[in-house]
């Protein structure tokens, strides 16, 4: 495997990556990289599986898609069949990262781990299910300099966040600044 550099970043795996919707690739002992395919310009998400003594730690989850749930089902009955999911960590609130967190936590009766701001903001955005944009939001973006074209796009997309994610669990385990968590324990 050859290290590759791009704009000062070093990619130790070079151009190697897991196949979309394929088998996990081990990048360190007990650390597995899985790629889930998604529709759109960003056509995939990288998901990490950390093998711990009490089960799997899942880092990020994919959008709420039937194809993603099917890929998870394949992992549950194949690669991950020896241990349950013990915890789900979401790195941030984007739907491709939190989309199936609630589904996984409910299925495996495990905790969601997130920072407070990401959990609370994600929960707030998931609550916007109406197609009607609040006037305060329109005023905010207009004052922020949105053009008429951007305002139209914002109005058309408003409320779609919740369609891309399952509801988050009602409780979570807060990740705090500088916290570390050893894996493979």
Give the residues covered by each predicted segment.
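N-terminal presequences and immediately downstream first alpha-helices
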Residues: 1-15
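Short acidic loop-to-beta-strand element that houses the catalytic metal-binding Asp/Glu
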Residues: 46-50, 179-185
């Amino acid at each position: 495997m050859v290290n590759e550099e791009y704009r000062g970043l070093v990619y130790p795996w070079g151009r190697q990556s897991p196949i979309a919707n394929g088998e996990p690739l081990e990048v360190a002992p007990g650390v597995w990289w899985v790629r889930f395919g998604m529709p759109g310009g960003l056509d995939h998400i990288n998901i990490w599986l950390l093998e711990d003594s009490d089960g799997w730690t899942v880092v990020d989850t994919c959008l709420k898609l039937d194809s993603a749930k099917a890929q998870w089902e394949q992992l549950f009955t194949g690669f991950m069949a020896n241990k349950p999911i013990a915890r789900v960590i979401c790195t941030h609130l984007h739907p491709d990262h939190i989309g199936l967190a609630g589904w996984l936590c409910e299925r495996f009766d495990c905790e969601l781990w997130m920072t407070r701001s990401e959990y609370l903001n994600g929960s707030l955005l998931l609550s916007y299910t109406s197609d009607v944009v609040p006037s305060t939001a329109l005023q905010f973006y207009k004052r922020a300099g949105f053009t008429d074209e951007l305002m139209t796009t914002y109005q058309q997309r408003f409320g779609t966040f919740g369609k891309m994610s399952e509801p988050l669990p009602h409780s979570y385990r807060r990740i705090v600044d500088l916290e570390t968590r050893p894996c493979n324990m």
